[in-house]
From Swiss-Prot:
Protein name per Swiss-Prot or TrEMBL: Glyceraldehyde-3-phosphate dehydrogenase 1
Source organism of this protein record: Methanosarcina barkeri (strain Fusaro / DSM 804)
Any one GO MF annotation of this record: NADP binding
Domain of life assignment: Archaea
GO biological process: glycolytic process; lysine biosynthetic process via diaminopimelate
Amino acid sequence: MVKAKIAVNGYGTIGKRVADAVRAQDDMEVIGISKTKPNYEAAVAHQIGYDIYAPAANLEAFEKAGMPAAGTIEEMVEKADLVVDCTPGGIGEKNKPMYEKAGVKAIWQGGEDHSLAGFSFNAICNYEQAVGRDLVRVVSCNTTALCRAIYPIDKELGVKKARVVLARRATDPNDVKKGPINAIVPDPIKLPSHHGPDVKSVLPQINITSAALKIPTTLMHVHTVNMEVEKDCTVDDVKNIFGSQPRIRFVGQGMSSTAEIMEFARDMKRPRNDMWENCIWPESITVGDKELYFFQAVHQESIVVPENVDAIRAMMEFESDGAKSIEKTNKAIGLSKK
């Protein structure tokens, strides 16, 4: 089997997870990852066998640190069929000319604007439209979770309007530079938050509004979701719809917080405690007068990872059926709802 040669530009929270997920597939391989500095993440990448590429000005620093770089980032890009850009928001836009010059396909993350790629991706919603594309943006963690939940409800019941309040984790567990530590921050104060409009970049037919708060935690986001639907339904109808989705998990069995969900991921021996699925509390699902409500938790560090793998497979035209790609990706990384 010919494998797609994938470069991961940016080996941070998302990049290192994407690299490992790509490595787990049988139809793609990681030809290199990029780091700007020879820090602990670069050291681990070197230890587990990734070829590291760095800015030309920093090659000597990597050499002195005992992890010689395989070349420059530009050289890595030249060797790739497709680059997954996992650099911080705003940096990816600056990298676009480099990808265009090399003639490679590129994926960006949700921190970049929709206009950068002209197409925003979610595997369950619009996989088939990504087949053969050269440029794709995988939407953010929150938008990914909302698309996964809204799309099947719209398909089965018709969504007249969605309203979402997001309690967002302040920062990732390894980030000591951000906060808040002892505050709740409306983010933004002016409504709506960007999440509703971002959902519309994938599902333009959905009438949605959103508001968000930053809270002093690092584990997960939590969404309070309300949808007005076209058809009468019951709680069991909604549970059956969500239960049929390959990347939605019900969290019951005494899990009443994000802390317990993360402990559950540890107990399942998930890599890095990752929870790639939407985590919906089934007892929160409430239905009445053609409206439904529920809570869901979102692991911001990992939920977009399988989406990136599916985007690669679509863009490389290895699989035209989104459901088959999702199944293949899930199996390879160990995403099982059992």
